[in-house]
Protein backbone atom coordinates (compact mmCIF):
# COMPACT_ATOMS: atom_id res chain seq x y z
CA UNK A 1 0.00 0.00 0.00
CA UNK A 2 1.18 3.49 -0.87
CA UNK A 3 0.34 6.50 1.29
CA UNK A 4 1.21 10.14 0.76
CA UNK A 5 1.10 12.07 4.02
CA UNK A 6 0.51 15.56 2.68
CA UNK A 7 1.17 18.98 4.15
CA UNK A 8 1.96 17.99 7.71
CA UNK A 9 4.47 19.55 10.08
CA UNK A 10 7.18 16.89 10.19
CA UNK A 11 8.92 16.70 13.55
CA UNK A 12 12.61 15.76 13.68
CA UNK A 13 13.42 15.23 17.37
CA UNK A 14 17.13 14.72 16.66
CA UNK A 15 17.63 17.87 14.61
CA UNK A 16 15.09 19.70 16.82
CA UNK A 17 13.20 20.99 13.78
CA UNK A 18 9.67 21.40 12.44
CA UNK A 19 9.30 21.29 8.64
CA UNK A 20 6.14 21.54 6.54
CA UNK A 21 6.63 18.75 4.02
CA UNK A 22 5.24 15.46 2.66
CA UNK A 23 6.10 11.81 3.30
CA UNK A 24 5.64 8.97 0.81
CA UNK A 25 5.18 5.51 2.32
CA UNK A 26 5.51 2.40 0.16
CA UNK A 27 5.70 -1.29 1.10
CA UNK A 28 6.04 -0.51 4.79
CA UNK A 29 8.94 1.89 4.38
CA UNK A 30 9.41 5.64 4.14
CA UNK A 31 10.34 6.06 0.49
CA UNK A 32 10.73 9.81 0.19
CA UNK A 33 10.37 13.06 2.16
CA UNK A 34 9.87 16.40 0.40
CA UNK A 35 7.35 18.35 -1.65
CA UNK A 36 5.75 15.36 -3.35
CA UNK A 37 2.88 14.26 -5.56
CA UNK A 38 1.87 10.70 -6.38
CA UNK A 39 -1.33 9.92 -8.26
CA UNK A 40 -1.25 6.26 -7.21
CA UNK A 41 -0.91 6.84 -3.47
CA UNK A 42 -3.74 7.28 -1.00
CA UNK A 43 -3.45 10.81 0.33
CA UNK A 44 -3.53 11.40 4.08
CA UNK A 45 -4.23 15.09 4.64
CA UNK A 46 -2.11 16.31 7.55
CA UNK A 47 -2.25 20.10 7.24
CA UNK A 48 -1.78 21.73 10.64
CA UNK A 49 -0.92 18.42 12.30
CA UNK A 50 2.40 17.19 13.67
CA UNK A 51 3.79 14.19 11.79
CA UNK A 52 6.09 12.40 14.22
CA UNK A 53 8.19 9.27 14.39
CA UNK A 54 6.08 6.51 15.90
CA UNK A 55 5.89 6.97 19.66
CA UNK A 56 7.42 4.39 22.00
CA UNK A 57 6.32 3.71 25.57
CA UNK A 58 9.27 1.92 27.14
CA UNK A 59 7.52 1.05 30.40
CA UNK A 60 4.26 -0.88 30.17
CA UNK A 61 2.74 -3.89 31.87
CA UNK A 62 0.91 -6.04 29.32
CA UNK A 63 0.20 -8.68 32.01
CA UNK A 64 0.65 -11.63 29.66
CA UNK A 65 1.34 -14.39 30.54
CA UNK A 66 -0.55 -14.98 33.76
CA UNK A 67 -2.74 -11.95 34.39
CA UNK A 68 -4.75 -11.74 31.19
CA UNK A 69 -7.88 -10.74 33.13
CA UNK A 70 -6.19 -7.34 33.69
CA UNK A 71 -4.70 -6.90 30.21
CA UNK A 72 -3.17 -8.97 27.43
CA UNK A 73 -0.95 -8.32 24.46
CA UNK A 74 -3.90 -7.79 22.11
CA UNK A 75 -5.81 -5.36 24.33
CA UNK A 76 -2.69 -3.58 25.55
CA UNK A 77 -1.35 -2.91 22.07
CA UNK A 78 -4.79 -1.77 20.88
CA UNK A 79 -4.78 0.74 23.73
CA UNK A 80 -1.25 1.73 22.73
CA UNK A 81 -2.23 2.33 19.11
CA UNK A 82 -5.21 4.42 20.15
CA UNK A 83 -2.89 6.41 22.39
CA UNK A 84 -0.47 7.15 19.55
CA UNK A 85 2.15 4.52 20.36
CA UNK A 86 3.56 2.29 17.64
CA UNK A 87 5.96 0.51 20.02
CA UNK A 88 5.91 -0.61 23.64
CA UNK A 89 8.47 -2.28 25.87
CA UNK A 90 6.84 -4.63 28.36
CA UNK A 91 8.05 -5.35 31.88
CA UNK A 92 8.81 -8.90 33.05
CA UNK A 93 6.59 -9.06 36.15
CA UNK A 94 4.26 -11.61 34.59
CA UNK A 95 3.35 -15.09 35.84
CA UNK A 96 5.67 -16.81 35.27
CA UNK A 97 8.24 -14.03 35.43
CA UNK A 98 10.00 -13.33 32.12
CA UNK A 99 13.29 -14.63 33.49
CA UNK A 100 14.08 -17.14 30.74
CA UNK A 101 14.30 -17.27 26.97
CA UNK A 102 11.08 -19.30 26.62
CA UNK A 103 8.92 -16.55 28.12
CA UNK A 104 10.58 -13.88 25.98
CA UNK A 105 9.98 -16.00 22.88
CA UNK A 106 6.35 -16.58 23.93
CA UNK A 107 5.71 -12.85 24.27
CA UNK A 108 7.27 -12.13 20.88
CA UNK A 109 5.24 -14.87 19.23
CA UNK A 110 1.98 -13.58 20.71
CA UNK A 111 2.88 -10.04 19.62
CA UNK A 112 3.65 -10.91 16.01
CA UNK A 113 0.37 -9.47 14.70
CA UNK A 114 -0.31 -7.02 17.52
CA UNK A 115 -1.43 -3.43 16.97
CA UNK A 116 1.97 -2.12 18.12
CA UNK A 117 5.49 -3.49 18.07
CA UNK A 118 6.36 -5.21 21.36
CA UNK A 119 9.85 -5.23 22.85
CA UNK A 120 10.11 -7.52 25.90
CA UNK A 121 12.29 -6.69 28.89
CA UNK A 122 13.86 -9.62 30.72
CA UNK A 123 14.24 -10.05 34.47
CA UNK A 124 17.50 -9.27 36.27
CA UNK A 125 17.15 -12.11 38.77
CA UNK A 126 15.34 -15.44 38.73
CA UNK A 127 11.74 -14.95 39.74
CA UNK A 128 12.63 -11.30 40.33
CA UNK A 129 13.53 -12.41 43.85
CA UNK A 130 16.82 -10.53 43.91
CA UNK A 131 18.92 -13.58 44.76
CA UNK A 132 20.21 -15.36 41.66
CA UNK A 133 21.08 -13.78 38.32
CA UNK A 134 19.17 -14.79 35.21
CA UNK A 135 20.86 -16.14 32.09
CA UNK A 136 21.16 -12.68 30.61
CA UNK A 137 22.83 -13.73 27.38
CA UNK A 138 19.99 -16.18 26.71
CA UNK A 139 17.43 -13.44 27.37
CA UNK A 140 19.19 -11.13 24.95
CA UNK A 141 19.45 -13.88 22.36
CA UNK A 142 15.72 -14.52 22.61
CA UNK A 143 14.94 -10.86 22.01
CA UNK A 144 14.95 -9.06 25.36
CA UNK A 145 15.97 -5.44 24.83
CA UNK A 146 16.83 -4.59 28.44
CA UNK A 147 16.83 -6.05 31.95
CA UNK A 148 14.73 -5.11 34.99
CA UNK A 149 13.16 -6.48 38.15
CA UNK A 150 10.61 -3.66 37.97
CA UNK A 151 8.44 -3.49 41.06
CA UNK A 152 10.78 -5.84 42.92
CA UNK A 153 13.92 -3.77 43.64
CA UNK A 154 17.18 -5.65 44.04
CA UNK A 155 17.98 -4.87 47.68
CA UNK A 156 21.34 -6.65 47.83
CA UNK A 157 24.00 -4.25 46.52
CA UNK A 158 26.40 -7.10 45.75
CA UNK A 159 23.78 -8.78 43.55
CA UNK A 160 23.09 -5.48 41.79
CA UNK A 161 26.82 -4.97 41.27
CA UNK A 162 27.11 -8.35 39.56
CA UNK A 163 23.97 -7.64 37.53
CA UNK A 164 25.55 -4.48 36.18
CA UNK A 165 28.89 -6.13 35.50
CA UNK A 166 27.27 -8.85 33.37
CA UNK A 167 24.81 -6.46 31.70
CA UNK A 168 27.70 -4.16 30.80
CA UNK A 169 29.53 -7.02 29.09
CA UNK A 170 26.38 -7.75 27.09
CA UNK A 171 25.86 -4.04 26.33
CA UNK A 172 22.37 -4.18 27.84
CA UNK A 173 20.62 -1.44 29.79
CA UNK A 174 19.61 -2.14 33.39
CA UNK A 175 16.29 -0.51 34.28
CA UNK A 176 15.98 0.10 38.00
CA UNK A 177 12.84 0.61 40.06
CA UNK A 178 14.47 2.57 42.87
CA UNK A 179 12.89 1.75 46.21
CA UNK A 180 14.33 0.68 49.53
CA UNK A 181 11.51 -1.64 50.51
CA UNK A 182 12.49 -1.55 54.17
CA UNK A 183 11.92 2.20 54.23
CA UNK A 184 8.70 1.91 52.21
CA UNK A 185 7.34 -1.22 53.90
CA UNK A 186 3.62 -0.91 54.62
CA UNK A 187 3.46 2.53 53.00
CA UNK A 188 0.32 3.49 51.12
CA UNK A 189 1.11 6.95 49.75
CA UNK A 190 3.67 9.76 50.01
CA UNK A 191 4.75 10.53 53.56
CA UNK A 192 3.54 14.01 54.40
CA UNK A 193 0.66 16.14 55.62
CA UNK A 194 -1.94 14.38 53.46
CA UNK A 195 -0.94 10.90 54.63
CA UNK A 196 -1.10 12.11 58.24
CA UNK A 197 -4.55 13.63 57.69
CA UNK A 198 -5.86 10.46 56.02
CA UNK A 199 -4.28 8.17 58.59
CA UNK A 200 -2.31 6.26 55.97
CA UNK A 201 1.27 5.10 56.45
CA UNK A 202 3.56 7.16 54.26
CA UNK A 203 6.44 6.33 51.94
CA UNK A 204 9.28 8.83 52.39
CA UNK A 205 11.11 10.36 49.45
CA UNK A 206 14.25 8.87 50.98
CA UNK A 207 13.06 5.36 50.07
CA UNK A 208 13.52 6.27 46.41
CA UNK A 209 16.48 8.59 46.66
CA UNK A 210 18.74 6.26 48.63
CA UNK A 211 18.42 3.63 45.89
CA UNK A 212 18.85 6.19 43.12
CA UNK A 213 22.13 7.18 44.77
CA UNK A 214 23.23 3.56 45.20
CA UNK A 215 22.50 2.53 41.64
CA UNK A 216 24.15 5.64 40.20
CA UNK A 217 27.32 4.77 42.14
CA UNK A 218 27.17 1.16 40.89
CA UNK A 219 26.72 2.39 37.32
CA UNK A 220 29.65 4.76 37.74
CA UNK A 221 31.79 1.90 39.08
CA UNK A 222 30.85 -0.68 36.42
CA UNK A 223 30.23 1.52 33.38
CA UNK A 224 26.85 -0.18 32.94
CA UNK A 225 24.09 1.74 31.20
CA UNK A 226 21.55 2.49 33.94
CA UNK A 227 18.02 3.71 33.31
CA UNK A 228 16.03 4.91 36.31
CA UNK A 229 12.34 4.13 35.99
CA UNK A 230 9.62 6.60 37.01
CA UNK A 231 11.62 8.92 39.25
CA UNK A 232 9.27 11.01 41.37
CA UNK A 233 11.15 13.26 43.80
CA UNK A 234 13.06 16.51 43.71
CA UNK A 235 16.02 14.73 45.29
CA UNK A 236 16.08 12.04 42.60
CA UNK A 237 16.12 14.66 39.84
CA UNK A 238 19.02 16.41 41.56
CA UNK A 239 20.99 13.15 41.91
CA UNK A 240 20.51 12.30 38.22
CA UNK A 241 21.51 15.81 37.15
CA UNK A 242 24.70 15.62 39.22
CA UNK A 243 25.51 12.13 37.90
CA UNK A 244 25.15 13.25 34.29
CA UNK A 245 27.49 16.15 34.97
CA UNK A 246 30.07 13.58 36.13
CA UNK A 247 29.60 11.53 32.96
CA UNK A 248 27.82 8.57 34.55
CA UNK A 249 25.96 6.53 31.86
CA UNK A 250 22.57 7.11 33.49
CA UNK A 251 19.22 8.04 31.97
CA UNK A 252 15.85 8.59 33.61
CA UNK A 253 12.15 8.59 32.88
CA UNK A 254 9.11 10.29 34.37
CA UNK A 255 5.44 9.40 34.04
CA UNK A 256 2.58 11.73 33.12
CA UNK A 257 1.01 11.20 36.53
CA UNK A 258 4.17 12.29 38.31
CA UNK A 259 4.35 15.58 36.39
CA UNK A 260 0.60 16.15 36.67
CA UNK A 261 -0.79 14.93 40.00
CA UNK A 262 0.19 15.44 43.63
CA UNK A 263 -0.58 13.60 46.85
CA UNK A 264 -3.81 15.61 46.98
CA UNK A 265 -5.26 13.23 44.36
CA UNK A 266 -5.47 10.58 47.09
CA UNK A 267 -8.00 12.70 49.03
CA UNK A 268 -11.18 10.70 49.32
CA UNK A 269 -9.06 7.52 49.37
CA UNK A 270 -9.15 7.23 45.58
CA UNK A 271 -7.52 3.89 44.79
CA UNK A 272 -6.99 4.95 41.16
CA UNK A 273 -4.44 7.43 42.53
CA UNK A 274 -2.56 4.72 44.42
CA UNK A 275 0.71 4.13 42.57
CA UNK A 276 4.30 3.20 43.30
CA UNK A 277 6.29 5.40 43.49
CA UNK A 278 3.50 7.43 45.07
CA UNK A 279 2.22 10.80 43.96
CA UNK A 280 4.36 13.39 45.72
CA UNK A 281 4.32 17.08 46.68
CA UNK A 282 3.85 20.02 44.33
CA UNK A 283 7.55 20.85 44.72
CA UNK A 284 8.37 17.38 43.40
CA UNK A 285 6.02 17.86 40.43
CA UNK A 286 7.77 21.13 39.60
CA UNK A 287 11.18 19.45 39.90
CA UNK A 288 10.07 16.71 37.48
CA UNK A 289 8.91 19.35 35.00
CA UNK A 290 12.22 21.18 35.30
CA UNK A 291 14.09 17.89 34.84
CA UNK A 292 12.13 17.27 31.67
CA UNK A 293 12.77 20.82 30.47
CA UNK A 294 16.54 20.81 31.02
CA UNK A 295 17.09 17.27 29.74
CA UNK A 296 17.92 15.64 33.06
CA UNK A 297 14.94 13.34 32.44
CA UNK A 298 15.33 11.73 29.02
CA UNK A 299 12.10 9.79 28.58
CA UNK A 300 8.39 10.03 29.29
CA UNK A 301 6.88 6.58 29.88
CA UNK A 302 3.50 5.64 31.29
CA UNK A 303 4.16 2.72 33.65
CA UNK A 304 0.80 1.51 32.27
CA UNK A 305 -0.36 -0.79 35.08
CA UNK A 306 -3.83 -2.22 34.51
CA UNK A 307 -5.84 -3.75 37.34
CA UNK A 308 -9.34 -5.24 37.27
CA UNK A 309 -12.23 -3.25 38.74
CA UNK A 310 -12.69 -5.62 41.66
CA UNK A 311 -9.04 -5.23 42.64
CA UNK A 312 -9.30 -1.46 42.92
CA UNK A 313 -12.82 -1.44 44.40
CA UNK A 314 -11.60 -2.18 47.92
CA UNK A 315 -10.37 -0.26 50.95
CA UNK A 316 -7.32 1.84 50.09
CA UNK A 317 -4.77 -0.25 51.95
CA UNK A 318 -5.86 -3.42 50.14
CA UNK A 319 -5.78 -1.99 46.61
CA UNK A 320 -2.82 -2.75 44.33
CA UNK A 321 -0.58 0.04 43.09
CA UNK A 322 -0.89 1.25 39.54
CA UNK A 323 -2.89 3.13 36.94
CA UNK A 324 -3.34 2.81 33.20
CA UNK A 325 -1.78 5.44 30.97
CA UNK A 326 -1.40 4.43 27.33
CA UNK A 327 -4.50 6.27 26.11
CA UNK A 328 -4.08 9.48 28.12
CA UNK A 329 -0.32 10.07 28.03
CA UNK A 330 0.00 12.04 24.80
CA UNK A 331 -2.90 14.33 25.65
CA UNK A 332 -1.41 14.99 29.07
CA UNK A 333 2.00 15.75 27.56
CA UNK A 334 0.60 18.27 25.10
CA UNK A 335 -1.82 19.79 27.64
CA UNK A 336 0.51 19.94 30.63
CA UNK A 337 3.95 20.40 29.03
CA UNK A 338 3.73 21.65 25.44
CA UNK A 339 0.91 24.18 25.68
CA UNK A 340 2.38 25.92 28.77
CA UNK A 341 5.76 26.14 27.01
CA UNK A 342 7.68 23.81 29.31
CA UNK A 343 8.68 21.67 26.32
CA UNK A 344 8.73 22.49 22.62
CA UNK A 345 7.07 20.00 20.29
CA UNK A 346 10.42 18.48 19.16
CA UNK A 347 11.56 18.21 22.79
CA UNK A 348 8.37 16.44 23.83
CA UNK A 349 8.50 14.14 20.82
CA UNK A 350 12.15 13.26 21.55
CA UNK A 351 11.13 11.89 24.95
CA UNK A 352 8.73 9.52 23.18
CA UNK A 353 10.87 8.55 20.18
CA UNK A 354 14.63 8.85 19.70
CA UNK A 355 15.39 8.95 23.42
CA UNK A 356 13.70 5.68 24.45
CA UNK A 357 15.16 4.01 21.37
CA UNK A 358 18.62 5.22 22.39
CA UNK A 359 18.16 4.09 26.00
CA UNK A 360 17.25 0.58 24.82
CA UNK A 361 19.98 0.45 22.18
CA UNK A 362 17.47 0.30 19.33
CA UNK A 363 17.55 1.96 15.95
CA UNK A 364 14.62 4.16 15.03
CA UNK A 365 12.86 7.13 16.51
CA UNK A 366 13.33 9.38 13.49
CA UNK A 367 11.58 9.79 10.12
CA UNK A 368 14.15 9.07 7.41
CA UNK A 369 13.92 7.62 3.87
CA UNK A 370 14.65 3.91 3.87
CA UNK A 371 13.43 3.30 7.42
CA UNK A 372 10.26 1.47 8.55
CA UNK A 373 7.15 3.64 8.38
CA UNK A 374 6.27 3.89 12.06
CA UNK A 375 4.43 7.19 12.27
CA UNK A 376 2.24 9.06 14.75
CA UNK A 377 0.22 12.11 13.73
CA UNK A 378 -0.96 14.59 16.37
CA UNK A 379 -3.74 17.16 15.99
CA UNK A 380 -2.65 19.92 18.39
CA UNK A 381 -6.11 21.51 18.45
CA UNK A 382 -8.21 18.40 18.98
CA UNK A 383 -9.73 18.11 22.45
CA UNK A 384 -11.52 15.27 24.18
CA UNK A 385 -12.84 14.63 27.67
CA UNK A 386 -11.49 11.36 29.06
CA UNK A 387 -14.26 8.78 29.47
CA UNK A 388 -12.81 5.70 31.22
CA UNK A 389 -15.65 3.50 29.95
CA UNK A 390 -14.55 4.12 26.36
CA UNK A 391 -10.88 3.26 26.84
CA UNK A 392 -9.66 0.19 24.97
CA UNK A 393 -7.60 -1.22 27.82
CA UNK A 394 -9.28 -4.12 29.60
CA UNK A 395 -8.85 -2.16 32.82
CA UNK A 396 -10.22 1.30 33.54
CA UNK A 397 -8.12 2.34 36.55
CA UNK A 398 -7.34 5.92 35.60
CA UNK A 399 -7.53 9.04 37.79
CA UNK A 400 -7.96 11.20 34.68
CA UNK A 401 -11.65 10.56 34.07
CA UNK A 402 -13.46 13.76 33.03
CA UNK A 403 -10.18 15.56 32.33
CA UNK A 404 -10.21 17.62 29.12
CA UNK A 405 -7.06 16.96 27.08
CA UNK A 406 -5.94 18.91 24.02
CA UNK A 407 -3.39 17.66 21.49
CA UNK A 408 -4.32 14.11 20.58
CA UNK A 409 -3.12 11.37 18.23
CA UNK A 410 -5.26 11.05 15.12
CA UNK A 411 -3.21 8.43 13.24
CA UNK A 412 -0.81 5.65 14.07
CA UNK A 413 1.00 3.68 11.39
CA UNK A 414 2.96 0.53 12.24
CA UNK A 415 5.41 -0.67 9.59
CA UNK A 416 3.41 1.06 6.88
CA UNK A 417 0.02 -0.29 8.01
CA UNK A 418 -2.65 2.07 9.28
CA UNK A 419 -3.68 0.95 12.76
CA UNK A 420 -5.59 4.00 14.02
CA UNK A 421 -7.09 6.82 11.97
CA UNK A 422 -9.32 9.70 13.01
CA UNK A 423 -9.52 8.39 16.58
CA UNK A 424 -10.85 5.02 15.37
CA UNK A 425 -8.94 1.76 15.57
CA UNK A 426 -8.90 -0.04 12.22
CA UNK A 427 -9.65 -3.73 12.60
Swiss-Prot record:
Zn(2+) 1 binds at residues 59, 61, 150, 303. Binds 2 Zn(2+) ions per subunit. The keyword Transmembrane helix does not apply. Substrate binds at residues 61-63, 93, 276, 307. Zn(2+) 2 binds at residues 150, 177, 230. Pathway: Pyrimidine metabolism; UMP biosynthesis via de novo pathway; (S)-dihydroorotate from bicarbonate: step 3/3. GO terms for molecular function: allantoinase activity; dihydroorotase activity; zinc ion binding. The keyword Zinc applies. Transmembrane segments: none annotated. Keywords: Hydrolase, Metal-binding, Pyrimidine biosynthesis, Zinc. It comes from the Bacteria. It catalyses: (S)-dihydroorotate + H2O = N-carbamoyl-L-aspartate + H(+). It is an enzyme of class 3 (hydrolase). The active site is at residue 303. PROSITE patterns: DIHYDROOROTASE_1 (PS00482), DIHYDROOROTASE_2 (PS00483). Belongs to the metallo-dependent hydrolases superfamily. DHOase family. Class I DHOase subfamily. Catalyzes the reversible cyclization of carbamoyl aspartate to dihydroorotate. This is Dihydroorotase. It comes from Desulforamulus reducens (strain ATCC BAA-1160 / DSM 100696 / MI-1). The gene is pyrC.
